Structure formats: C-alpha cells, structure tokens
A protein has these predicted regions:
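Active-site phosphate-binding strand-loop segment of PLP-dependent enzymes
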Residues: 109, 121-176
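Active-site C-terminal subdomain of aminotransferase-like
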Residues: 193-273, 287, 356-358
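PLP-dependent enzyme catalytic core of the Aspartate aminotransferase-like
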Residues: 3, 315, 328-358
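Conserved active-site segment immediately N-terminal to the catalytic lysine
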Residues: 169, 183-194
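A glycine-/small-polar-enriched, mobile loop at the entrance of the PLP active site in fold-type I
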Residues: 2-53
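Conserved PLP-binding catalytic core of the aspartate aminotransferase-like
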Residues: 282-313
Length: 358
C-alpha cells in the first residue's frame, strides 16, 4: 500500500531526494565521511552551499542586488530579525492580519519595541478570506508584512498589495517555491525549509542589499549584514539541511522549474477543491478566490465524524490529515513533493467515506 504524507510540516520530500540522501549517509562523494560529519569549512560543503544558492537564484530569477542567506531558527526567528534589521528609521511596521502566523509576526515585532499597525484583517470572518489594506499607508511605515500562504486557515495571496515605496516583506514559509512570485516585488522574503524545501533546521532569507546594514548593535545571530558578509558562515550552518535543500532545488529544476511546479500544484489543488465543492458531507470554509494550493482545510461539521475520517484515512495510507488544533477538522497539505496520485487517492477515499456515512 502506498503511503501519502499530508503533513503541514515537516512535510513530504521527493522520493529521489530521499534516495540520494541515503546514498550520501555512509560516504559523501566518495570522501569516506558521511554528509552528517563533513566540515562546514571544507571544499565539499563550499560546493554544496554555493550550488544551492545558485540553483535557488536560477529557479526564482533572483536579481543580483538581493542577498541569499542561510539561517537557522525557523520562520519564527525572522519575526524578530526582520524588524531589528529593517524597521530602523521609525520602528513602525504595517501588518496584514491574515491569521495565526501573521499575528505571531506582529507579536514578536512588538517585543522588540516596534510599533505594529494592522492595515487590514479578516478576523471578523474567521480568516475565511484574505484581508485588504483598508486605509492609506502611513509614510512612517518601515515596511509592510505579508504572509503569502496561511497554513492553518488555508488562504494564499497571489495578487500582492500595493505599497508604493514602502518595502513589502513576505513570510513565504508554506508556499515558498510552490507558487511563482517576482522577487523584485519584495524587499525581503523568508521561509522555513520544512514545507517545500527540505527537512527542518534551515531558513532561507532573500533580502535587497540596500535595506540591510543600517541597524546598530544587533545580536550577531540576527544580523543580516553580518550573515551576508560572512556568506552565511558566521557560525556553523545547518550542513545537512542545506545539503538536503540543495538536492530538492536540483529536483525542482528537473521537474521543469517553478512555473511548471506552480501549474502542477494548481492542478492538484483543483482536484481536491472540485470534490469538496460538490460534496454533500465535506466543506471547505475558504472564499474560492483566496484558497491556498498548499494547505486545504475541510470539515464534516461533526467532530466525531472528523475523527473517523482521520482514523480511516490512516488505514488507507493517507497520513497526517488532522487539522491544526486551533481549528480542528482535517487539512491536506499538497506541497511540491505530493504527487497527483496522492491527491487522487485522498479524493477516492473521501468519496467512499461519504457514500458510507452520508
């Protein structure tokens, strides 16, 4: 029986990548050393990290005036790093409140004495749609914070808000490399790797050069300029996580690149949404135009029935469908490495469940 992992993160990895990792565990590139033990100062790893950066630049068409930084600490650390590095003029940022992770970003910014102005919120409708900017932008805003994909609520931004000369920064953790964006539309992009890029332990930061280097007396581990100057080698980077991410990037190139993967992701999501929309048992609460292609929440409206759906799914090799604890129900995460056959298997199971229980 095939196994399909619908976890929101850490998430499914491409099978060819897992096979390459297995081969590198005993001896990486015939060095006699495992990938888990090579030095971050070695020529072997220098090639790994340089290749990973170049492949990322190729896939996303990253302009030359942007730096690519390899951080640790997850996207959550960037909720602190971003205001410390970029909110240096007025210590004031704007935030689009699209749900849990946007709120977390605002909370962390306030912890470092940054004023947070909520520019729009969809809280009144339980985050079933994306917020819009509801007021003129204050010229004292150092930047506007956007969560491009809301993993819990199941919404995703494709049409970016107009912010004029105010930099737009994006937490892309859950649709990084799963949806096409133009890097030059952003001052900063950050993303935890554990959705579409690799195992947990690595965070990618892509930042425009002119925005960094203005903060003073930053903690070293949060300093974008320092990491840029040291080529992400200020301290020991997450060697294995960067290696695994590099393999995923090469796999993504082999799949046709970002445009091809975006199209595949839209097709996978459409298959599931089309079923949910015609279902008499399952519903998706999200406004159709704002639906995520990465994370699809759905419910029966009955907690006991939801639990039965999840338990039965596990018996059919459909794993990790339980929704986030804050919303309940089910959630299917359809990241890049989830094949169309996995989504079809889920739809077939849900249809059979509905026929039996409705």
């Amino acid at each position: 029986m095939p196994i399909y992992n619908f976890s929101a993160g850490p998430a499914v990895l491409p099978q060819p990548v897992i096979a390459q990792i297995q081969a590198a565990l005993p001896s990486f590139r015939n060095s006699g050393m495992s990938i888990l033990e090579i030095s971050h100062r070695s020529d072997l790893f220098e090639q790994v990290i340089n290749d990973a950066e170049q492949d990322l630049r190729d896939l996303m068409a990253i302009p030359d005036n942007y730096r690519v930084l390899f951080f640790q600490g997850g996207g959550t650390l960037q909720f602190t790093a971003a205001p410390l590095n970029l909110a240096t003029n007025h210590h004031h940022i704007g935030l689009l409140d699209s749900g849990h992770w946007a709120q977390r970003a605002g909370d962390e910014a306030q912890r470092v004495d940054t004023k947070v102005t909520v520019l729009g919120s969809s809280a009144a409708t339980h985050y079933d749609r994306l917020p819009t900017i509801e007021q003129p932008l204050d010229p004292t805003l150092d930047y506007v914070h956007l969560t491009t994909n809301n993993t819990i609520e199941g919404t995703m931004t494709t049409d970016l808000p107009a912010t004029g000369d105010i930099p737009l920064i994006a937490d892309m953790s859950s649709n990084f490399l799963g949806e096409s964006y133009r890097v030059s539309d952003f001052g900063l992009i950050f993303a935890g790797a554990q959705k579409n890029l690799g195992p947990a332990g690595l965070t990618l930061v892509i930042v425009r050069e002119d925005l960094i280097g203005h903060a003073q007396q930053l903690p070293s581990m949060l300093d974008y300029q320092l990491f840029a100057d040291k080529h992400s080698m200020f301290n020991t980077p997450p060697v294995f996580a960067i290696y695994a991410a590099g393999l995923v990037l090469k796999w993504l190139k082999q799949q046709g690149g970002l445009a091809a993967m975006t199209a595949r992701n839209h097709a996978k999501a459409a298959l599931l949404y089309d079923f949910l929309d015609q279902s008499q048992l399952f519903t998706n609460p999200v406004k159709a135009s704002d639906r995520s292609t990465m994370n699809v929440p759905f419910v029966t409206g009955n907690a006991e029935l939801d639990a039965a759906v999840i338990a039965g799914a596990s018996q059919h090799g459909l794993l990790n469908l339980k929704g986030h604890r804050s919303v309940g129900g089910m959630r299917a995460s359809l990241y890049n490495a989830m094949p169309l056959t996995g989504v079809q298997a889920l739809v077939d199971y849900l249809a059979a469940f509905e026929a039996q229980h409705h």
